[in-house]
């Protein structure tokens, strides 16, 4: 198992992904995050449990493909990223939308 230092845990989780599908997954106590492409499932689990103080029961990851992006006559691409869907134990939640 890979040793992860607490200072690098925050670097593994980049941001939560808030899309229509990700919002529907919240009902099943599943949360979607963009993570570092080199992160492994045990590292992601350790990072989520440490940062949010929750119990993770499952993780599925997928590498999202590079998509072409055109702006005028210039053709480029969107960066590739890794998406992690994290399932929490029923008694835990993550507050992604804090009260204002």
Curated annotation (Swiss-Prot):
GO terms for cellular component: ribonucleoprotein complex; ribosome. GO terms for molecular function: rRNA binding; structural constituent of ribosome. Gene3D superfamilies: 3.30.70.330. GO terms for biological process: translation. Keywords: Ribonucleoprotein, Ribosomal protein, RNA-binding, rRNA-binding. InterPro entries: Nucleotide-bd_a/b_plait_sf, Ribosomal_uL23-like, Ribosomal_uL23/eL15/eS24_sf, Ribosomal_uL23_CS. Belongs to the universal ribosomal protein uL23 family. Part of the 50S ribosomal subunit. Contacts protein L29, and trigger factor when it is bound to the ribosome. One of the early assembly proteins it binds 23S rRNA. One of the proteins that surrounds the polypeptide exit tunnel on the outside of the ribosome. Forms the main docking site for trigger factor binding to the ribosome. This is Large ribosomal subunit protein uL23. The gene is rplW.
């Amino acid at each position: 198992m890979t040793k992860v230092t607490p200072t690098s845990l925050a670097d593994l989780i980049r941001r939560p992904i808030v899309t229509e599908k990700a919002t529907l997954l919240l009902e099943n106590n599943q949360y979607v995050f963009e993570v570092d492409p080199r992160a492994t499932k045990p590292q992601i689990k350790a990072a989520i449990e440490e940062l949010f103080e929750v119990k993770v029961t499952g993780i599925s990851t997928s590498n999202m493909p590079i998509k072409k992006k055109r702006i005028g006559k210039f053709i480029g691409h969107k960066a590739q990223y890794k998406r992690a869907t994290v399932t929490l134990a029923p008694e835990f939640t993550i507050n992604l939308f804090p009260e204002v």
